[in-house]
Regions:
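Residues forming the flavin
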Residues: 1-266
Length: 266
């Protein structure tokens, strides 16, 4: 469930294992977006270690990973100054790549389909199906062609049930079915609650003299106050393009704070 990096990688790995062991299996991926990658909006830093294992010849197969990270900077901002901070291991992106996650996902979808994976875009998974013993049986997709009033239109198509020996939930952050499964099986028992943030990203085209291909910069501090969790990222990739993003933790206390307005100040 979900044609993102995790779901497609799982589908590819299953097909690879089936081929290695001489078994015929059907692998189906349902994706609510109009195409694979439609909801993958991040301008991402990608560590290729997992891709090296999954598809060792990814370079020959044209994976959209071309811009390596050449320099890391972490800064603390005030309204008028920027202070360089030490690079901690979690911010060391040496040998990683700056990439569009949407492009990477579309490429992974092509690799999956080449292996025989069936991908169904435009189908939102709506319900988890269970066996009588309580184990997961599969999922049901939502009805299509329903009007604003909730009534079927002329193009109505009922949802379909997909039964499987194994169901993998790869919906990403706050997936609707994942929440059902977490509640059903108490998967969050004795666990710390998840934290969430609201991120805003834009792609800028900058003059060539200001473009530093491969530069990755993260910041904390201004324009947020000391009580508000968040920060920014600036990634210089190809063609004078820069991904500029700003993230604010959703636990901010000031009810008048607008993450978008803070992004504009930044």
């Amino acid at each position: 469930v979900g044609a993102g990096p995790s779901g497609l990688s799982a589908a590819i790995k299953l097909k690879q294992l089936a081929e290695k062991n001489g078994r015929e299996i059907s692998v189906c991926v349902v994706e609510k977006g109009s195409e694979a990658g439609a909801h993958s909006l991040a301008g991402a830093i990608i560590d290729p270690i997992s891709l090296n294992e999954l598809i060792p010849d990814w370079k020959e197969k044209g994976a959209p990973l071309t811009r390596t990270v050449t320099k890391d900077r972490v800064v603390f901002l005030t309204e008028k100054k920027a202070f360089n901070l030490p690079i901690t291991p979690n911010f060391d992106n040496h040998a990683n790549y700056i990439a569009s996650l949407g492009e990477v996902v579309r490429w992974l979808a092509e690799q999956a389909e080449n292996l025989g994976v069936e991908i169904y875009p435009g189908f939102a998974a709506a319900e988890v199906l269970y066996h009588e013993d309580g184990s997961v049986k599969g999922i049901a997709t939502g009805n299509m062609g329903v009007g604003k009033d909730g009534e079927p239109t002329d193009s109505f198509q009922p949802g379909m049930e997909l039964w499987a020996q194994q169901t993998i939930f790869a919906e990403g952050c706050r997936g609707s079915l994942s929440k059902q499964v977490i509640e059903q099986f108490k998967l969050d028992q004795n666990s710390e609650p998840q934290t969430y943030g609201l991120g805003i990203k834009e792609i800028w085209e900058v003059p060539s003299e200001k473009h530093q291909p491969g530069l990755v910069m993260h910041s904390a501090g201004w324009p947020l106050d000391s009580k508000t969790y968040g920060g920014s990222f600036i990634y210089h990739f190809d063609d004078n393009k820069v991904a500029v993003g700003f993230v604010v933790g959703l636990d901010y206390q000031n009810p008048y704070l607008s993450p978008f307005e803070e992004f504009q100040r930044f």
